[in-house]
Design a protein with these regions (language model features):
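Extreme N-terminal starter segment of soluble prokaryotic enzymes
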Residues: 1-3
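Protease-domain processing segments flanking chymotrypsin-fold serine proteases, especially trypsin-like
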Residues: 5-7
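Glycine-rich phosphate- or other oxyanion-binding loops that anchor nucleotides, phosphorylated ligands
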Residues: 9-173
Length: 173
């Protein structure tokens, strides 16, 4: 069975409203919360695969605000050189553009060849790898990283994310 992990209840509520039976779990915000939740969910629920779904900021303006993308790989932005391991997704949902992402604790960290940034992805993929559970990541871009917070389109991007998850979920049932 496939479970969907979503960082916040706000992001999850739209998916639950549209699809009450969706197998949604809350991952929490940030690397520590996402790692702990992912490990607990794997240990307690023994899923066949996991999909992390949430919003992200884009550093590359070729990625549109409100576009939904699949993350091919994640890096922890603040780690130096040899410690900057790339965590690859185990599968890519069909029909989505793929991007590289930085996992960071704050917005606007140097992009280093990535198109988007978020706060949970590398931790999620690292735990999936450690437990041998296939993991994928889907993100809806809510803003550009240099936009003021007042310009972020969180609700609209979360709505697009929910519609995309509903569309791809049958592929993994």
């Amino acid at each position: 069975r496939t479970l969907i992990l979503i960082p916040t209840e706000t992001e999850a509520a739209l998916l639950r409203a549209a699809c009450p039976d969706a197998p949604v779990r809350i991952a929490g915000v940030g690397m520590a919360a996402a790692a702990a939740a992912t490990a607990r969910i794997i240990a307690e629920e023994h899923p066949d695969r996991l999909i992390l779904a949430g919003i992200a900021g884009a550093s590359d303006r070729s990625v549109a605000v409100c576009e939904v993308v699949a993350v091919a790989g994640e890096r922890i932005a603040e780690l130096p050189g040899k410690y900057a391991v790339r965590y690859a997704a185990d599968f890519i949902p069909a029909g989505l553009r793929t991007v590289e992402s930085n996992t960071t604790n704050r917005t606007g960290v140097a992009a280093s060849g990535t198109q988007i940034e978020n706060m949970e992805g590398a931790a999620f993929l690292a735990v999936c790898r450690a437990f041998g559970v296939p993991g994928a990541e889907v993100r809806a871009v809510s803003n550009y990283t240099d936009d003021p917070r007042s310009a972020w389109r969180i609700e609209e991007s979360a709505e697009k994310l929910a519609k995309t998850i509903i569309r791809i979920l049958p592929d993994y049932e």
